[in-house]
């Protein structure tokens, strides 16, 4: 039972902060530099698909829908890695493979010039962001995201309310983590 209380580095605030920093940078990068596409949370892209369809702009609808498809594929890839890679057999944790894939893909993207291949970059980044959000779901036992802010903002606010009502220092800690991840994302 000794391992039951052991904290995983994959749930540490430090790692979550770094991943949130990367997540926020990638969202800003793809939106500002790569054709106004959101790479992390797909809500914005789904809204842009709807707007494009309302204007009968099918090319733009497809352009914004492809990252959504890549995100779905990223979740499936991550779940496949999680299911097939067993630490006892490989001596590598499945989350390390996800981080490794993220690093390799980002390294390759760094050499793709802006402009003509922005769609490929956006699809690739949406894929790795899905892998990240699927692999790193918790911070010190609390469900938080390193690639989007809405849920973290809700969790932080709820925990502040509960901290005041219940006079709980633990709720303050959770709220601080949630707001901290939002700050690192921005």
Question: Which residues does each PLM region occupy?
Answer:
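Alpha-helical transmembrane segments of multi-pass membrane proteins
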Residues: 2-186
């Amino acid at each position: 039972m000794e391992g039951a209380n052991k904290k995983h580095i994959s749930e540490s605030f430090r790692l979550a902060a770094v991943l949130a920093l990367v997540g926020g940078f990638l969202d800003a990068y793809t939106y500002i530099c790569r054709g106004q596409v959101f790479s992390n949370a797909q809500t914005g892209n789904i809204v842009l698909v709807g707007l494009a369809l309302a204007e009968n702009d099918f090319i733009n609808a497809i352009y914004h829908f492809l990252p959504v498809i890549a995100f779905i594929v990223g979740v499936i890839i991550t779940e496949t890695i999680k299911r097939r890679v067993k630490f006892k057999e490989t001596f590598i944790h499945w989350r390390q493979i996800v981080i490794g894939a993220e690093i390799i893909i980002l390294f390759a993207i760094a050499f793709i010039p802006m402009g003509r291949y922005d769609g490929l970059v956006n699809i690739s980044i949406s894929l790795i962001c899905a892998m990240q959000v699927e692999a790193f779901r918790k911070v010190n036992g609390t469900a938080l995201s390193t690639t989007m802010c809405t849920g973290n903002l809700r969790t932080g606010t709820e925990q502040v309310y509960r901290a005041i009502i219940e006079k709980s220092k633990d709720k303050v800690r959770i709220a601080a983590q949630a707001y901290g991840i939002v700050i690192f994302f921005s």
